[in-house]
Every structure is written in C-alpha cells, then in structure tokens.
C-alpha cells in the first residue's frame, strides 16, 4: 500500500494519546455534518444539487468500504471473519433502522419535510445510528500502522455534508427550529468523536481476527446505510445522472487511497 493510503500525518497533539487522536479525526469527519446543516439552513440548495452531492459521497464511501475496510480485513484474517463481520454489520443496521423507522424516524434524511410526523427522539437516534459505524471505522483504521486512513476520513467527511444538508432542509420544512436542528447535529458530532475513540481504545490490544471482524462489521453497516438512505435519496432528486456521479466519487476515493 502507498504511504497516503496508510494514513494521515498525525496532528501535533503533544503527549495526547492515540485514543484522543482517534477522537480528533472522528470529530473532523463528523464536523462535516455541521457544515452541511448550515448550508441546508442558510441557502436554498436545489434538490438536484443535493442529490448529486449525495451520489458523489456515496461513491466515496463505497470505495472506502471496499478497499480501506473489507480488503484490509481479508488480507489479515481471510474470508470467514469478513463474511461474519459484513453480515453482522448489515443485519445490525437493518434491524436498528427498521425499529427506528416504526417509531418515527423513517424520513430523517429526506429534504422534503416528511419528518413533520416523526418522533424527535427517534430522529435523533436514527442520526446516531447512521453516524456511529462510520466513526468506528475511523478509529479502527488507526490500528493499521498507527495512523488514520486518509480515504476513510475523506469518505466520511464528503458523505456527511450532503447527508446533513438534505436532512436539515427537511427538518426545517417539517417545523423544527434552527436551534434544535443544529443541536441535533452537534450531538451527533460529539458521539462520532467518542465512537472513533472507542473504535481504537477498545481494540488496541485485540488480535488481528477481532480487528478484521470489526472492520467488516463497520463496512457492512455503512454499506447497508448507503443502499437504504443515501442512494435512493440521491436518485429521487437527481435521476439517472447519479450513477455517473457515484462512479466519479468511487474513482476519486480510489485514486486518493492509492496516491
């Protein structure tokens, strides 16, 4: 693997532990949620633009899932841990998403105001469910070579902007205040940082097979989230063009991870 794929240069954090470094990069990835929310609340972004940006972010995340998580897990521990992790992550997200959908969080990422009839608590939990697997992936990436994977952080950052942009627009149309919406995403950012730290802290001394299962678990959850929310929303707003834009996002992340 090339140097860039192995990781980002560590920030100057003095004697701060690697766990705090993981939290820092989790915060960086999650901070994009605040950026997207501000854009969605301040500017009237055309739905087609939101759809295209979501498609690009989906392509970036698919690449990170394939090469930064799944491939590395397979290289270190073989096929069985990858299959178990992918299946477990996908099933966990599916069940959690299904439960939240039936308690008022079904349209939490939509931009058309469908959240009006939703349960605010379920919407918050749904946002956390979407963000935690990505953040855990950031923390776990630190376990490979001691530096966080640039493609993982970039993928999470680029995908989070359109996610929160779309959701913030919809939540505002549904009648939620700007303060409530920004508070929601701020909470998700904090939890994202904690999840990234936990991803490293809980697995720092774990055997390679455990790390591989965790990588694949995060990959399965993220992939299921993409297919369930981001990709359908992108297609709804931007039509068949999203296929090309998704491919471009995949290519961009692939080249970034192999630079």
Please state what every model-predicted region is.
Residues 2-259:
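Intrinsically disordered, metal-sensing/regulatory segments
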């Amino acid at each position: 693997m090339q140097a860039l794929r192995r990781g980002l240069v560590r920030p100057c954090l003095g004697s701060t532990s690697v766990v705090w470094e993981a939290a820092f990069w989790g915060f960086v990835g999650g901070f994009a949620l605040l950026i997207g929310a501000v854009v969605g609340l301040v500017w009237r972004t055309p739905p087609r633009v939101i759809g295209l940006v979501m498609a690009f972010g989906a392509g970036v995340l698919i690449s990170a899932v394939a090469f930064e998580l799944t491939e590395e897990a397979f290289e270190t521990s073989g096929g069985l841990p990858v299959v178990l992790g992918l299946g477990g992550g996908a099933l966990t997200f599916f069940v959690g998403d299904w439960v939240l959908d039936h308690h008022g969080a079904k349209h939490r990422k939509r931009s058309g105001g469908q959240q009006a009839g939703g349960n605010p608590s379920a919407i918050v939990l749904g946002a956390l469910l979407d963000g935690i697997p990505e953040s855990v992936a950031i923390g776990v990436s630190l376990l490979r070579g001691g530096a966080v994977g640039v493609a993982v952080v970039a993928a999470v950052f680029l995908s989070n902007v359109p996610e929160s942009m779309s959701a913030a627009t919809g939540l505002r149309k549904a009648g939620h205040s700007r303060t409530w919406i920004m508070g929601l995403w701020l909470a998700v950012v904090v939890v994202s940082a904690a999840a990234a730290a936990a991803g490293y802290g809980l697995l720092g001394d774990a055997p390679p097979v455990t790390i591989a299962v965790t990588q694949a678990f995060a990959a399965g959850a993220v992939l299921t989230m993409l297919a369930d929310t981001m990709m359908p929303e992108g297609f709804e707003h931007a039509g068949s063009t999203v296929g090309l834009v998704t491919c471009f996002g995949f290519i961009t992340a692939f080249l970034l991870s192999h630079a």
